[in-house]
Amino acid sequence: EGHAGGSGHARLNRARNRHADYYRDRHFKSFPVDAMHPWQSANKQFHNQQAAMERLAAETSGVDDGVGEIMATLRRLGLDENTIVVYAADQGWMGGQNGIWGMGDHTKPFGAHELMMQIPLLFRQPGRISAGRTCDYLVSNYDFLPSVLHHLGLGERIPGRPRLPGRDFSAVLAGRTADWDNVIYYEMEDTRAIRTDRWKYVARHPSGPFELYDMKADPQERFNLYGQPGTEPSRADAAARLAAFFSTYADPRFDRWNGGRNAARLQAP
């Protein structure tokens, strides 16, 4: 039934797994009840709905069961000690935070809120990756390929063309520190964003709306500081870095800022 939470009106039906009864009539602190964000364009019928919360919680726990089955199968086949296991996702999900239910393309304009961008990224490889460690570096999906290839001793397999934006965090997997610029870049069709330790800046083609958040003072992204007095130097620096990144790495065919078309056509071309 598609991504987490099912699809269509199925999200208001009970999940068909062993967790459905456990979550029935539960109060979910992780799903805040808030006024609907004016940009919410899809999933409006699920907003603040107990049934939708129960469904998403049960299906998330169902994913945990699936991971357990995979690990049990690796153990049964004698492969669990020499297999690198990576748990990741393609995108995040907002469960009522900021008044939004869903992913980045469930708002118009497309969103770049923190929970839309955050994904799990867990590695397991006994003997080579120490268990129980966490890392506070800002990393992105585009860092995955060079990091894993270097970790496996296959760094020479990294393609030279097209030029890739990914960085190598394999040192972190080995328990060392890495020379790391703590910044990530994000794009979904007409929406682009840069996230640093301190700031998140969001730009949209062709003329906004724009967003600027102080992620230290406002981690829940409640107060858009774009255009506010005193923030112009931070905005200008973020905008310049964002433009430089995509001028280097964007595929010209899909570079909306320079005449390209939308890659997935989730919104008007």
Language model: regions and residue ranges:
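Catalytic-site neighborhoods of secreted/periplasmic enzymes
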Residues: 1-5, 11-14, 106-108, 182
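Long, internal low-complexity/basic segments
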Residues: 3-9, 15-28, 32-51, 59, ...
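Beta-strand elements within well-structured catalytic alpha/beta cores of enzymes
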Residues: 4, 56-63, 67, 84-89, ...
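Flexible, surface-exposed loop/gating regions in the mature catalytic domains
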Residues: 35, 47, 52-57, 100, ...
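Active-site rim elements
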Residues: 45-60, 107-109, 128-139, 152-160, ...
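Surface-exposed alpha-helical segments enriched in charged/polar residues
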Residues: 68, 72, 240-243
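Histidine-centered active-site microenvironments of extracellular/periplasmic hydrolases
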Residues: 72-128, 140
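C-terminal cap/loop subdomain of S1 sulfatases and analogous C-terminal strand-loop tails that border
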Residues: 93-105, 137-145, 149-215, 220, ...
